[in-house]
Amino acid sequence: MNNAAKRADCWFGAKNYGRAVYECLRGGLYFTKDDENVNSQPFMRWRDRFLFCAEAVYKAQAETGGIKGHYLNATAGTCEEMIKRAVFARELGVPIVMHDYLNRGIHRKY
């Protein structure tokens, strides 16, 4: 296995989610991805998630010497908001964002 998706609906919170990304990448995976339903939820806001995940990727790369990545879910309710999120990811130096076009704008609660 060389990639993994973590389930965010277990109420991780952004900091712990970033830690899970780091542990996966540090443990040998090449990339991870956000769950399709992760947009911006009360327990994990998108900006915080982006920051902690970017930090995790860079830390894992520095420690392993390998190329690592994480697919950040930039899905939002409007095109303008998605572009805002993608631009923020680019400013963090994150080369990969994903957009769930079938779920766009739908914020599921379990």
Curated annotation (Swiss-Prot):
UniProt KW Nucleus keyword: no
Compartment(s) where it occurs, according to its Swiss-Prot or TrEMBL record: Mitochondrion
Keyword terms of this UniProt record: Mitochondrion
Gene Ontology CC: mitochondrion; plastid
Transmembrane annotation, as ranges: none
Keyword Mitochondrion: yes
Family: Belongs to the RuBisCO large chain family.
Classification via PANTHER family: RIBULOSE BISPHOSPHATE CARBOXYLASE (PTHR42704), RIBULOSE BISPHOSPHATE CARBOXYLASE LARGE CHAIN (PTHR42704:SF16)
Protein name listed in UniProt: Putative uncharacterized mitochondrial protein AtMg00280
